[in-house]
From Swiss-Prot:
The chain crosses the membrane at residues 22-42, 58-78, 92-112, 116-136, 148-168, 170-190, 224-244, 247-267, 278-298, 313-333, 353-375, 406-426, 431-451. Keywords: Cell inner membrane, Cell membrane, Membrane, Sugar transport, Transmembrane, Transmembrane helix, Transport. Catalyzes the proton-dependent transport of sialic acid. InterPro entries: MFS (IPR011701), MFS_dom (IPR020846), MFS_trans_sf (IPR036259), SA_transporter (IPR004742). It catalyses: N-acetylneuraminate(in) + H(+)(in) = N-acetylneuraminate(out) + H(+)(out). It is a multi-pass membrane protein. PROSITE patterns: MFS. One of its GO terms (cellular component) is plasma membrane. This is Sialic acid transporter NanT. The gene is nanT.
Length: 496
């Protein structure tokens, strides 16, 4: 950018159409967050009515993650072929319909299936909305676009917590799911009046339809085998997370089977760049493993371990959700200033100072707990607002929605594991200690994976001929694409 351009406030670089596009996508994310966290808020009520164990109840949270990989793949491919806008509308209809079905669920299995539908819609919303907004905004503002957008999910969670405190004590938990369907009408109207993403329009102007990941996997020469593997993965995940299997060895075998299937899909769809795709799935997996024990089980911790009433729970969750929302926006500014990966690492390191105190102080002082949660979530959870931008930079426009959707939502199975792992550890320790231990230890893994740019590094080690050296979204260099010695030599040459 020129000096004159840099002196203009960032928001003046955006026109009315770009703001309208962002507003529509942000509203979709708010609804997504509202619908998704409802189950966490009423988990104890559902558990009591259906007579579930703690692990079975936690699996209702996990259910939405089980179907996300397929929803991200299918709806992402729809976005790559037909445009980001159609994929967004389809996604929001899916997760809203699933939310309504939860309100009518007569038992555990029915609610589990409804949560699968929510997961598919949520996955499509993530991939299509993120690519839509990122591709609509100027390149130098795309961390802000990503962070601001993802803040909508946290705002939706805050709104859900406040509605929970007003609705559930009077009308019961089912009424909360009925409310989750109402905003869909306005969202659909808004989505019909927004422009298509600029990057997508430019890429597809006057050209034949692109060959999407769905075309490669389900219309190519290996389509029969891939359909069989898809059914096998769905069945394996069902048995792993529906709370029916007690044998850890069988669960481990099924988990390895799913891992092999997902890697096979990544190899087929990305070709020589499969090491990058696989490592991105690993990054997202650990990102969910460190963050989602708290996201999913914090309401349960507040109600059981701290014995808070619904009103107090809602107040504490307000601090938590609002902190995450603020953190998404702060992360956007940090990402555009420091660079995506450096901002991510710095924010996570700062969050580590707060995670132990959050669960060590107990529940005597609600305000202190709320403030600690606000800052911990701002730094630890909020920085995930720029994760779509980080992942999307490794994919070309033609496969960005499906690549982001599939990669992110396969890794998001960590979110399915997280509450169950937390619940299992809580059978031996108290829940607060379990949540703090998981989050503290696994955050360091994410710091290393992102800080060392392991997707580029592993690509360079295994398939260097397909190495991408610069971010496809903002054009900035990937640190892991260049050996340390070469990077130092290049710097010397540049200065001389």
């Amino acid at each position: 950018m020129s000096t004159t351009t840099q002196n203009i406030p960032w928001y003046r670089h955006l026109n009315r159409a770009q703001w309208r596009a962002f507003s529509a996508a942000w509203l979709g994310y708010l609804l997504d967050g509202f619908d998704f966290v409802l189950i966490a808020l009423v988990l104890t009520e559902v558990q009591g009515e259906f007579g579930l164990t703690t692990v079975q109840a936690a699996s209702l949270i996990s259910a939405a993650f089980i179907s996300r990989w397929f929803g991200g793949l299918m709806l992402g491919a729809m976005g790559d072929r037909y445009g980001r806008r159609l994929a967004m509308v389809t996604s929001i209809v899916l997760f809203s319909a699933g939310t309504l079905a939860c309100g009518f669920a007569p038992g555990y299995i029915t609610m589990f299936i409804a949560r699968l539908v929510i997961g598919m819609g949520m996955a499509g919303e993530y991939g299509s909305s993120a690519t839509y907004v990122i591709e609509s905004w100027p390149k130098h503002l795309r961390n802000k676009a990503s962070g601001f957008l993802i803040s909508g999910f946290s705002v939706g969670a805050v709104v859900a917590a406040q509605v929970y405190s007003l609705v559930v004590p009077v009308w019961g938990w089912r009424a909360l799911f009925f409310i989750g369907i109402l905003p869909i009408i306005f969202a659909l109207w808004l989505r019909k009046n927004i422009p298509e993403a600029e990057d997508w329009k430019e890429k597809h102007a006057g050209k034949a339809p692109v060959r999407t990941m769905v075309d490669i996997l389900y219309r190519g020469e290996h389509r029969i085998a891939n359909i069989v593997m898809t059914l096998a993965a769905a069945t394996a995940l069902w048995f792993c997370f529906a709370g029916n299997l007690q044998n850890a060895a069988i669960v481990a075998v099924l988990g390895l089977l799913c891992t092999a299937i997902f890697i096979s899909f990544m190899v087929q769809s990305t070709g020589k760049r499969w090491p990058t795709g696989v490592m991105l799935m690993v990054v997202v997996l650990f990102a969910f493993l460190y963050s989602w024990p708290i996201q999913a089980l914090l309401p349960t911790y507040l109600k059981t371990d701290l014995a808070y009433n619904p009103h107090t729970v809602a107040n504490v969750l307000f601090f938590s959700g609002f902190g995450a929302a603020v953190g998404c926006c702060v992360g956007g500014f940090l990402g555009d200033w420091l660079g995506t990966r450096k901002a991510y690492v710095c924010s996570l390191l700062a969050s580590q100072l707060l995670i132990i105190p959050v669960f060590a102080i107990g529940g005597a002082n609600v305000w202190v707990l709320g403030l600690l949660l606000f800052f911990q979530q701002m730094l630890g959870q909020g920085i995930a607002g720029i994760l779509p931008k980080l992942i999307g930079g490794y994919f070309d426009t033609d496969q960005r929605a499906a690549g982001l959707g599939f990669t992110y939502n396969v890794g998001a199975l960590g979110g399915a594991l997280a509450p169950i792992i937390g619940a299992l550890i809580a059978q031996r320790l108290d829940l607060g200690t379990a949540l703090a231990s998981l989050s503290f230890s696994l955050t360091f893994v994410v710091i290393l994976l992102i800080g060392l740019d392991m997707p580029s590094r592993v690509q360079r080690w295994l398939r260097p001929e397909a190495l991408r050296t610069h971010d496809a979204i903002d054009g900035k260099p990937f640190s892991g694409a260049v050996p340390f010695g070469s990077a130092k030599n290049d710097l010397v040459k540049t200065k001389s």
